[in-house]
């Protein structure tokens, strides 16, 4: 586990039980709700929520259809909170790479407001391609910022922050990770 992943783990372990009322929890809620609107699920689908936090997104998605719901997060305390809140879902403390799932085992993969914490984003995109079934979908909700804000975050703030933030990307950069992994149908 890299330095930034260790920082993320520490920060989210500390806020796990109060996440929904913390600024981070309130900020991420609309992004999660956007995924909930867009994700079309069928009974029997396998869903993986990466960096699932306290399980809110996965728990709500699992109510849309009779799905097999899996969530992973680097924070053990977030996973404990998720298990308590959504006992019908399966949760595990795990990093985002490598994904510990079989090839072509998932119908849907979601990531909400966490991609900027990933130390190896290209490896993550490759792993998504590996574990997704044919015609599977990845939903990523990530905030996009102006070039000036991105530059400040990436060169001034993140190198010195202790929150585990690695890099914020523009939409094209994010798209390129998935194109390089072999994804051909990418919507924004």
Locations of the language-model features?
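A short glycine-rich, Lys/Arg-flanked "PGG" loop and its adjoining helix->strand segment in the class I
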Residues: 122-134
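Conserved class I S-adenosyl-L-methionine
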Residues: 1-40, 56-60, 78-81
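A conserved beta-strand element that flanks and buttresses the S-adenosyl-L-methionine
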Residues: 110
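Class I SAM-dependent methyltransferase SAM/SAH-binding core
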Residues: 48-50, 54-98
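Short glycine-centered segments of the SAM/dcSAM-binding site in methyltransferase folds
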Residues: 46, 136-137
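C-terminal alpha-helical "lid/dimerization" subdomain adjacent to the S-adenosyl-L-methionine
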Residues: 4, 22-26, 57, 140-181, ...
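Short catalytic micro-motifs in class I SAM-dependent methyltransferases
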Residues: 113-114
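Local beta-strand N-terminus motif with an aromatic residue
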Residues: 44, 106-107
């Amino acid at each position: 586990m890299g330095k930034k992943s260790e920082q993320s783990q520490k920060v989210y372990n500390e806020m796990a039980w109060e996440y929904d009322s913390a600024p981070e929890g309130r900020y991420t809620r609309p992004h999660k709700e956007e995924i909930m609107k867009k994700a079309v699920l069928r009974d029997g689908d396998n869903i993986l929520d990466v960096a699932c936090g306290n399980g809110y997104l996965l728990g709500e998605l699992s109510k849309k259809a009779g799905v097999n719901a899996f969530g992973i997060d680097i924070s053990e305390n977030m996973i404990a909170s998720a298990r308590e809140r959504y006992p019908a879902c399966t949760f595990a403390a795990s990093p985002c790479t490598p994904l510990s799932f079989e090839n072509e085992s998932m119908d849907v993969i979601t990531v909400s407001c966490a991609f900027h914490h990933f130390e190896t984003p290209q490896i993550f995109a490759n792993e998504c391609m590996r574990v997704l079934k044919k015609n599977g979908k990845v939903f990523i909700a990530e905030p996009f910022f102006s070039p000036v804000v991105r530059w400040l975050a990436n060169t001034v703030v993140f190198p010195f922050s202790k929150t585990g933030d690695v890099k914020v990307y523009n939409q094209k950069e994010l798209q390129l990770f998935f194109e390089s992994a072999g994804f051909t149908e990418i919507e924004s």
